[in-house]
Swiss-Prot record:
GO CC entries: cytosol
Stated name of the protein: tRNA sulfurtransferase
UniProt record similarity statement: Belongs to the ThiI family.
Domain THUMP: 61-165
Organism, as annotated: Escherichia coli O157:H7
Domain Rhodanese: 404-482
Subcellular compartments: Cytoplasm
Catalytic activity reported: [ThiI sulfur-carrier protein]-S-sulfanyl-L-cysteine + a uridine in tRNA + 2 reduced [2Fe-2S]-[ferredoxin] + ATP + H(+) = [ThiI sulfur-carrier protein]-L-cysteine + a 4-thiouridine in tRNA + 2 oxidized [2Fe-2S]-[ferredoxin] + AMP + diphosphate; [ThiS sulfur-carrier protein]-C-terminal Gly-Gly-AMP + S-sulfanyl-L-cysteinyl-[cysteine desulfurase] + AH2 = [ThiS sulfur-carrier protein]-C-terminal-Gly-aminoethanethioate + L-cysteinyl-[cysteine desulfurase] + A + AMP + 2 H(+)
One biological process term in Gene Ontology: thiamine biosynthetic process
Main location group: cytoplasm
Disulfide bonds: 344-456
GO MF assignments: ATP binding; CCA tRNA nucleotidyltransferase activity; tRNA binding; tRNA-uracil-4 sulfurtransferase activity
Length: 482
C-alpha cells in the first residue's frame, strides 16, 4: 500500500531552505509515529510531497488514521501506483478502479501531471472522462458538484490511481518551533490550547498545579497523555506536577478575599516560569479567554503577566466558550473535561475584575514565598510515556455515606469565610471545622478513635481530601453527602 502526504500550504510558501527543513522534520515525525505499526515501512520525502509505503495490509486503516493526526499534513491520498504506456492505458486502469463507484452517479475527472509527456492534464481528463462515460451507461458527466470526482496523478511513467483522500489537521510539523509549557488543568480550555500549539509546530510539555490529591492528578495525567498520544507522540515530552495545596492554603489564610484569584494566578505563573527556565522552555501556554472569568480581564491579565519575563501565549484569548467546547469535542477531550472536578474552596466570593498593582503587591507581602519555592523544588517530573502505566495503578477508594453513627464526627473542610457565611448545623452529630488546606498538617491532631466524615458544598473537595488522607494511612475518614 502507498500513501502520498500533501504538505500544509503554509509550508509550501516558505523559502527553499526553510521548506526543506520543515519537510525533513515532518518526515522524521511520520517515521517516529508509524514505526510502532510496521517495521518495514518506508517514508520517502520529495519536494512537494512525502511517500509512505508499507507492506502489512492489516495495518492500512491504523496507518491512515495516524497520518490524519500528525501536524503538518494537509491531506493524505491513498493510492495505487502502476506503470502506464499511453492515455488509453490510463483510461483502462481508471475504468477497472472506478467502474463500481460510478454506477448510477455523476462524475468528473481531475488530473495532475508531472514530467515530460506528449499530452496535457486536460487531454487526459477529456480522454478518460469520455471513455468512462461511454463504458458505464448509468454514469453521467457533471463538471460542477459531481457525486464522484475521479482523481488521477501522472508522474513520468507512473500512474497514481487515487483510492481515497483523507484530510489531515494541517499546521506545522512538531519541532519546527520551540518548546512550550502548557498549564493544564484538565478542563476544556487548557486541553484545546495545548492542541493548538502542537498544531502550530511546538513540542508541548505539561505543568499541572495539583489542588486536590491523587485522584485529580490522575485525571489530568490522562488528558495530557491522550493529547500527546493522539497528536504529539513523535516527540518525548515532560509532565510536571506541582502540589499547590500549601500555596492555596497560604493564600486563603493571609490574602484579602477579592485579590485571591489574581494572586493565585500570579503564583502559578511564577512557579511555571521557574519550571520553564529549568528545562529551557521558551513560553507558557494557558487556556485563558478574555472576560471568561474575573481574573481574565485585560487589567488582571496584565498584572498576571507582570510577575514573569517568560512569554505567555493565550491561543484562546478571543474564543467564546461554545467555540472552545466544539473544538474539545473535535479533538476528543470533551468527555475528560466534563468529568473533571471543580473546587469549592479555592474561589473568592467577590473577586476583583480590575486589580490595582499596589494593592496586589501589598497583599503579596503577607505571603511566605518560601512555600512557593519549596513546592517548585519538590515538583514531580515524569516522562509522559510512563503515564499510561502509572495511571493504571489502583486509586485508593473512599466510602461515601448519607447518615452517621454514634462514633462519627462531621468535618467541615470549607474555607473559613465560607464557614462563617453559611455555618453547617446537623442535628444529632458534632460538627468540627478544619479548612481543607490545613488537613495535611492538622488532621493527625484530631481524635483518631473517631470516624471523620468530610463535608464541603459540592462534595468534590471532600472526596479528594478523603482520598489524600487515606493515602497517608488514615483509615477513619469517609465522605458525607446527605
Amino acid at each position: 500500500m502507498k500513501f502520498i502526504i500533501k504538505l500544509f500550504p503554509e509550508i509550501t510558501i516558505k523559502s527553499q531552505s526553510v521548506r526543506l527543513r520543515f519537510i525533513k522534520i515532518l518526515t522524521g515525525n511520520i517515521r517516529n509515529v508509524l514505526k510502532h505499526y510496521d517495521e518495514t515501512l518506508a517514508v520517502v520525502r520529495h519536494w512537494d510531497n512525502i511517500e509512505v509505503r508499507a507492506k502489512d495490509e492489516n495495518q492500512r486503516l491504523t496507518i491512515r488514521d495516524a497520518l490524519t493526526r500528525i501536524p503538518g499534513i494537509h491531506h493524505i491520498l491513498e493510492v495505487e501506483d502502476v506503470p502506464f504506456t499511453d492515455m488509453h492505458d490510463i483510461f483502462e486502469k481508471a475504468l477497472v478502479q472506478y467502474r463500481d463507484q460510478l454506477d448510477g452517479k455523476t462524475f468528473c475527472v481531475r488530473v495532475k501531471r508531472r514530467g515530460k509527456h506528449d499530452f496535457s492534464s486536460i487531454d487526459v481528463e477529456r480522454y478518460v472522462g469520455g471513455g468512462l462515460n461511454q463504458h458505464i451507461e448509468s454514469a453521467r458527466v457533471k463538471l460542477t458538484n459531481p457525486d464522484v470526482t475521479v482523481h488521477l496523478e501522472v508522474e513520468d511513467d507512473r500512474l497514481l490511481l487515487i483510492k481515497g483522500r483523507y484530510e489531515g489537521i494541517g499546521g506545522f510539523p512538531i519541532g519546527t518551533q520551540e518548546d512550550v509549557l502548557s498549564l493544564i488543568s484538565g478542563g476544556f480550555d487548557s486541553g484545546v490550547s495545548s492542541y493548538m500549539l502542537m498544531r502550530r509546530g511546538c513540542r508541548v510539555h505539561y505543568c499541572f498545579f495539583n489542588l486536590g490529591g491523587a485522584a485529580h492528578e490522575i485525571g489530568v495525567r490522562q488528558v495530557a497523555h491522550y493529547l500527546w498520544n493522539r497528536f504529539g507522540s513523535s516527540h518525548r515530552v515532560r509532565f510536571v506536577a506541582i502540589n499547590f495545596e500549601p500555596v492555596v492554603g497560604e493564600i486563603l489564610e493571609k490574602i484579602d478575599d477579592g485579590q485571591m484569584g489574581v494572586i493565585l494566578k500570579r503564583m502559578m505563573v511564577r512557579a511555571a516560569s521557574k519550571v520553564a527556565e529549568r528545562y529551557g522552555v521558551q513560553a507558557l501556554v494557558t487556556g485563558e479567554a478574555l472576560g471568561q472569568v474575573s481574573s481574565q480581564t485585560l487589567t488582571n491579565l496584565r498584572l498576571i503577566d507582570n510577575v514573569s519575563d517568560t512569554l505567555i501565549l493565550r491561543p484562546l484569548i478571543s474564543y467564546d466558550k461554545e467555540h472552545i467546547i466544539n473544538l474539545a469535542r473535535q479533538i476528543g477531550t470533551e468527555d475528560f473535561a466534563r468529568t473533571m472536578p471543580e473546587y469549592c474552596g479555592v474561589i473568592s466570593k467577590s473577586p476583583t475584575v480590575k486589580a490595582v498593582k499596589s494593592k496586589i503587591e501589598a497583599e503579596e507581602e503577607k505571603f511566605d514565598f518560601s512555600i512557593l519555592d519549596k513546592v517548585v523544588e519538590e515538583a514531580n517530573n515524569v516522562d509522559i510515556r510512563e503515564i499510561a502505566q502509572q495511571t493504571g495503578q489502583e486509586v485508593v477508594e473512599v466510602e461515601t455515606v448519607n447518615d452517621f453513627g454514634p462514633n462519627d464526627v462531621i468535618l467541615d473542610i470549607r474555607s473559613v469565610d465560607e464557614q462563617e457565611d453559611k455555618p453547617l448545623k446537623v442535628e444529632g452529630i458534632d460538627v468540627v471545622s478544619l479548612p481543607f488546606y490545613k488537613l495535611s498538617t492538622k488532621f493527625g491532631d484530631l481524635d483518631q478513635n473517631r470516624t471523620w466524615l468530610l463535608w464541603c458544598e459540592r462534595g468534590v473537595m471532600s472526596r479528594l481530601q478523603a482520598l489524600y488522607l487515606r493515602e497517608q494511612g488514615f483509615k477513619n475518614v469517609k465522605v458525607y453527602r446527605p
